[in-house]
Amino acid sequence: CLVGSEMCIRDRSRHMIAVTSETSPLAKSDDYLAAFFMDDYIGGRYSSTSAVGGAVLSLAFGPDVFAQFLKGAAEEDALAKEKDLSKNPAMLDALIGVYERNVLGYSDTAVLPYSQALSRFPAHLQQLDMESNGKSVNRFGEPVNYVTGPVIFGEPGTNGQHSFYQLLHQGTDIVPPQFVGFKNNQMEKDVVIQGSTSQQKLCANVAAQIVAFACGKDDEDNNKKFEGGRPSSIIIGEKLTPAAMGALLSHFENKVMFQGFVWNLNSFDQEGVQLGKVLAKRVLAHEIDGALKVYSDLLNI
């Protein structure tokens, strides 16, 4: 049926599903083919492996792909329970991040995936990390006297190289990059140009950037001099498969959780999101005064 058509609205129980919590009014409705439930306490940024992600991914790619995605996430979750730090990559990554933030004083982290398929992944991690650990009070509601979550930003590798890498290499602030790279292209066919594949060229750029950040380059011309000494980390996979994607998501979710433990934060609420929503409703209801009225008038609301 055509979305919005009378027939579609009348027969939506044959064409639509609901993903909701069991306490939602949707859970008791007969207007949907099926309802899939998620727990009330699961925030959107942690919902990729819940019914929210399952419904979308299964419809788009099939249930087998979603099953592989879950398998990769589950395997990474199992590693997060390891007591041996050398076998627990999420914990190790979390502690490196805490050291960079609280000991070295770096306020930002750049996430740099060398795969166009992960072009929106830095934006997801931006929400995951900053919404979870961008807090100034601990889980007991007490103000903290130390810095917490960093600013997260990023772009796919070679795009970033021709934009903000300049600041990462020669800027006055040190921003630790976190690279994500894969040995093999997820596409079965790759092109060979001048003796190397496109994937090999991507990997060559990753290796070059890591060494450039660490070692720098001396030059009599200060404008061409690179101080080096800029730390970075890298996550390497064989190929970006559904299982690898699930593992990657799980890795960063556990990393954020571990950092929340260290900083004694509640990484699973987002009170900072609510204030803007409340004020926006006041603006639309014209219940405003002071600065809120000034900006409402300025924007002709």
Feature annotation, model-predicted:
Residues 195-202, 214-215, 237, 259-261, ...:
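Extended, charge-enriched "interface" segments that sit outside catalytic cores
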Residues 10-189, 228, 275-279, 284-301:
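Active-site phosphate/pyrophosphate-binding segments
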Residues 121-124, 163-165, 189-198, 223, ...:
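Short conserved micro-motifs at the rims of enzyme active sites and ligand-binding pockets
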Residues 189-222:
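Acidic, Ser/Thr-rich peripheral helices and adjacent loops at domain boundaries
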Residues 39, 43, 111, 115, ...:
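Generic secondary-structure boundary/loop-capping signal
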Residues 217-229, 233-234:
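Generic long, charged, amphipathic alpha-helical segments
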Residues 1-4, 9:
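Single conserved hydrophobic/aromatic residue that forms the stacking wall/gate
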Residues 224, 239-292:
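C-terminal structured subdomain/cap of oxidoreductase catalytic cores
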